[in-house]
Regions:
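Anion (oxyanion) recognition and catalysis
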Residues: 121-122, 199
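Short, surface-exposed loop/turn motifs that are enriched in glycine and acidic residues
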Residues: 104-107, 127-128, 162-166
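Conserved phosphate-coupling serine/threonine residues in phosphotransfer and NTP-handling enzymes
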Residues: 131
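A short helix->loop->beta-strand "cap" motif at the edges of active sites that frequently abuts
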Residues: 123-126, 203
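N-terminal helical cap/lid subdomain that shapes the substrate entry/recognition surface
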Residues: 3-116, 123
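Asp-based, Mg2+/Mn2+-dependent phosphohydrolase catalytic module
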Residues: 1-16, 135, 139-257
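Hydrophobic "anchor" residues on beta-strands that sit immediately upstream
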Residues: 22-24, 128, 186, 224
Length: 257
C-alpha cells in the first residue's frame, strides 16, 4: 500500500545537493481559490458513514458530528451512539476527501489567477505545497491541475492524528524541510495559523491577502505581506542576494535547531 510518506518522498527532489532554502505554499486560498472545502461536503460525508452504520442522528448531536474538529463534542456524540469516535472520524474524513475530489473534478473550484508565479519561483529555489487539507485531495489538485513545479507535496493525514498535526502545529512543514534538505525559507499562507506554523518551523511567514481575507485582522506579525504571488519573486531575489530567502533582515528565516 502506498502511504502518504511514500508519496511525499516520490515528489521530493531526487539527487543533487541539499537545498538550503525553499519556498513552501499553503493550498486553499493561495493556490486554489476559496477558503477551503465546502461544509456541505462534510455533511454529505457524514450521511454516508451514518447510513452505512444504520444510524439516524439529528439536532445538536448531528451538528457535533458534522464539525471538522475531533473535539469533545464529537467524541461525546459518538459515545452517546455507541460508536468508536476515532473510527467514525477517519471514515467520515475518507468520504469527505472522496467527495471533495469529485467536486474538484467537476470544476467547482479553480486555480488562483497568479499561480504562474510559482514556476518563476521554482526556477530560483525548490518549492513545496503543504496544506491542512486532506492529503488525497492535495495530491489530486497537483495532478489534476498539473502543478509540476512542486518538489514536495503534503496534505494532512486522515483521522485524529492528522487533525492534531494541522497548522499551527509545524509537523508537516518540518517534514517538508527535512525531505528537501532545507534549513530555511518562506511559507506563504492566507491565515494566522500559517504565519504561526511558519515561525515554529523556523521559516518566515508570508501573508497573502486576497479578496476572501481582505478584512482579516491577522493578529500576528508576518515576515512580509503581499497581495499577489508575483510579489514573491522579488522577495526571493532580494533574499538570495545575501544568502537567505527571507523578507526581513533579522535572520529569523534560518532553521537552526
Amino acid at each position: 500500500m502506498t502511504t502518504a510518506a511514500d508519496s511525499t518522498r516520490r515528489r521530493a527532489t531526487a539527487g543533487g545537493d541539499a537545498a538550503d532554502r525553499v519556498v513552501l505554499f499553503d493550498m486553499d486560498g493561495v493556490v486554489l481559490d476559496g477558503w477551503g472545502t465546502d461544509s456541505a461536503v462534510h455533511a454529505r460525508a457524514l450521511d454516508d458513514v451514518l447510513d452505512e452504520r444504520g444510524l439516524a442522528v439529528t439536532g445538536d448531536r448531528r451538528r457535533s458530528l458534522e464539525s471538522d474538529s475531533y473535539d469533545d463534542g464529537f467524541r461525546d456524540a459518538c459515545a452517546a451512539l455507541g460508536v468508536d469516535p476515532a473510527a467514525l472520524f477517519r471514515d467520515r474524513e475518507e468520504r469527505s476527501a472522496k467527495r471533495s475530489i469529485e467536486r474538484l473534478a467537476a470544476g467547482t473550484r479553480r486555480l488562483c489567477p497568479d499561480v504562474d508565479a510559482i514556476d518563476a519561483v521554482a526556477e530560483r529555489v525548490p518549492v513545496g505545497l503543504v496544506s491542512n487539507n486532506y492529503h488525497p485531495t492535495v495530491e489530486f489538485v497537483v495532478d489534476h491541475f498539473r502543478l509540476d513545479a512542486f518538489s514536495f507535496v503534503r496534505g494532512r493525514d486522515l483521522g485524529p492524528e492528522g487533525f492534531r498535526r494541522r497548522k499551527p502545529d509545524p509537523h508537516y512543514l518540518d517534514e517538508a524541510l527535512d525531505a528537501l534538505g532545507a534549513r530555511g525559507g518562506l511559507y506563504v499562507g492566507d491565515r494566522a495559523t500559517d504565519v504561526i506554523a511558519a515561525e515554529r518551523a523556523g521559516l518566515d511567514g508570508v501573508f497573502l491577502r486576497r479578496e476572501h481575507n481582505a478584512a482579516l485582522d491577522l493578529g500576528v506579525e508576518p515576515g512580509a505581506e503581499i497581495g499577489s504571488l508575483h510579489e514573491l519573486i522579488g522577495l526571493v531575489d532580494a533574499g538570495s542576494s545575501d544568502g537567505a530567502v527571507r523578507p526581513g533582515a533579522d535572520g529569523t528565516g534560518d532553521r537552526s535547531r
